[in-house]
């Protein structure tokens, strides 16, 4: 089961979130049939949004858009505060690796663009923030967003490891933030430790990735686990929701679907679920609008 662990240093000067998002990204890959680079890019975006959502309260919904002008197109993710996330990538077929090492490439093929967040508090006035993509690797872009938009210096690591068949093996990440009152000495100590910590791919490959991440972040310093919550890929689409969308169309469009297509099929972008509407369904929608 995927999980996010929230923790704080014994001194109260730093906090860290660590995530095991393996099943989340596996589900996304299965639903969208993504190839290697697209899988890693989508997975990192989902993990970033899981971190953002874990930092919100109430019934907020958080949308993350990674908008590049190169191979991937747009990557869209929506998360809630209950641990659910969904998402899709426009180009599912990007599959580019370094010849010598087999490393899956993301950043060089993201292009120029923006990291956009939309936080909907349910009040009708969502908060939108846009920062430029710095590297296109998504983790660094997310850290830059946190520093620039939320004014919180943050260290972030996100990654997705694939097996020999390019299927998701393990996925996860971390976020470390200095809290008000952290001394310059403490900040320097954490910065040094984070710079020297093993690659996140190495930590995720450990027997217990969450423990490996926490140990690398805190080293010999004490810390307290504040909470552990479950995470999952879950889409909230439904036939009723798409029926409402059809009701917003002009009757002439609905009649064309009846006359020309003898029905309609709608595919959810976020989870690829297919919804069928028969001729009778469409006639019923027209009648309901009358």
Swiss-Prot record:
PTM annotation: Under oxidizing conditions two disulfide bonds are formed involving the reactive cysteines. Under reducing conditions zinc is bound to the reactive cysteines and the protein is inactive.
Any GO molecular function: unfolded protein binding
Protein name per UniProt: 33 kDa chaperonin
Protein family: Belongs to the HSP33 family.
The protein's role, per its UniProt record: Redox regulated molecular chaperone. Protects both thermally unfolding and oxidatively damaged proteins from irreversible aggregation. Plays an important role in the bacterial defense system toward oxidative stress.
Disulfide bonds: 235-237, 268-271
Gene3D superfamilies documented for this protein: Hsp33 domain (3.55.30.10), HSP33 redox switch-like (3.90.1280.10)
UniProt keyword list: Chaperone, Cytoplasm, Disulfide bond, Redox-active center, Stress response, Zinc
Any one of the GO CC terms: cytoplasm
Localization (cell): Cytoplasm
Gene, per the UniProt record: hslO
One GO biological process term: protein refolding
Transport found in the keyword field: no
InterPro entries per UniProt: Heat_shock_Hsp33, Heat_shock_Hsp33_C, Heat_shock_Hsp33_N
Keyword Chaperone: yes
